[in-house]
């Protein structure tokens, strides 16, 4: 009978060990599932953030390109005005400059 009791005790221990292994395996699987879910959630958040940043970048890029076109037009207008002022100023003093050159070229000095 004692050997029966010993066999029963061993069987109980083996059964308890198997149950413990099942519990550990289930816990490990649950942990892996949680990690996988957390990874997928993090990847989804990263993708959403990346898309948001890309949209913001494209919006700012479009704004700056629009501003660039306006700046080009403004600079062209300012340049035309400055060229006109320079030409007008040159026309005003053109006669005097030509006369001064003629005077210096035709005057003989000893």
Curated annotation (Swiss-Prot):
This is V-type proton ATPase subunit G. Keywords: Hydrogen ion transport, Ion transport, Transport. GO terms for cellular component: vacuolar proton-transporting V-type ATPase, V1 domain. It comes from the Eukaryota. Catalytic subunit of the peripheral V1 complex of vacuolar ATPase (V-ATPase). V-ATPase is responsible for acidifying a variety of intracellular compartments in eukaryotic cells. V-ATPase is a heteromultimeric enzyme composed of a peripheral catalytic V1 complex (components A to H) attached to an integral membrane V0 proton pore complex (components: a, c, c', c'' and d). It comes from Citrus limon (Lemon). Belongs to the V-ATPase G subunit family. GO terms for molecular function: ATP hydrolysis activity; proton-transporting ATPase activity, rotational mechanism. Pfam families: V-ATPase_G.
């Amino acid at each position: 009978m004692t050997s029966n009791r010993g066999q029963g005790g061993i069987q109980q221990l083996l059964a308890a060990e198997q149950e413990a292994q099942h519990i550990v395996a289930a816990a490990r699987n649950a942990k892996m599932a949680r990690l996988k879910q957390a990874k997928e959630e993090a990847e989804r958040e990263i993708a959403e953030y990346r898309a948001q940043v890309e949209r913001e970048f494209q919006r700012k890029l479009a704004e700056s390109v629009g501003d660039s076109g306006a700046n080009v037009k403004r600079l062209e207008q300012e340049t035309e005005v400055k060229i006109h002022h320079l030409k007008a100023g040159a026309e005003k003093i053109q006669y005097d400059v030509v006369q001064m050159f003629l005077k210096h070229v035709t005057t003989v000095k000893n």
